[in-house]
């Protein structure tokens, strides 16, 4: 099992003990069955094994409060599949857990992991034009705005040499 810690959070890979939480949290558009959740978990575990130093394949971690380490409150990770040659940071928090600084803690710890543990050369991220909370997360994590998307969103980056732990 993989686990990263922040001040308030545990970011970790999920296990079969977390199937009920996957069912509860993977609720779009109409939810998933326990069997589908088992398939999701199997995919997460397969992807985790494919990550190598300098080459993230896909890392999806459950976000847990340290005070409630069994309840998933969000997802975060690093993706190397969607944009080949890039490592992309992602995060999403359950609505009840937003505006608490949790996404910023996730972003900072994932950047540390990408640069210090996985030797990535850079990490990218983006948000929609109306998602200013996510824009601020990337700013607070130290990422630099580099361009606008064709739909008016924002593209951010951080190079390894610019990372400060």
Which residues does each PLM region occupy?
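Acyl-donor (CoA/ACP) binding surface of acyl/acetyltransferases
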Residues: 1-33, 47, 57-165
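Active-site rim helix/loop that mediates acceptor-substrate recognition in acyltransferases
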Residues: 36-57
């Amino acid at each position: 099992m993989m686990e990263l810690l922040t001040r308030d959070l545990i970011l970790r890979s999920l296990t079969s003990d977390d199937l009920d939480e996957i069912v509860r949290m993977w609720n779009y558009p109409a939810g998933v069955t326990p069997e589908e959740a088992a398939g999701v978990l199997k995919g997460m575990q397969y992807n985790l094994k494919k990550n190598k130093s300098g080459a993230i394949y896909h890392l999806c971690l459950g976000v847990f409060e340290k005070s409630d380490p069994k309840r998933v409150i969000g997802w975060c990770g690093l993706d190397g599949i969607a944009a080949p040659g890039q490592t992309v940071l992602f995060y999403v928090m359950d609505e009840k857990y937003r505006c608490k600084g949790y996404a910023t803690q996730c972003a900072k710890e994932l950047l540390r992991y990408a640069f210090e543990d996985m030797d990535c050369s850079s990490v990218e991220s983006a948000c929609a034009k109306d998602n200013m909370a996510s824009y601020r997360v990337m700013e607070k994590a130290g990422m630099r705005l580099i361009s606008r998307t064709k739909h008016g969103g924002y593209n951010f980056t951080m190079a390894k040499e610019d990372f400060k732990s």
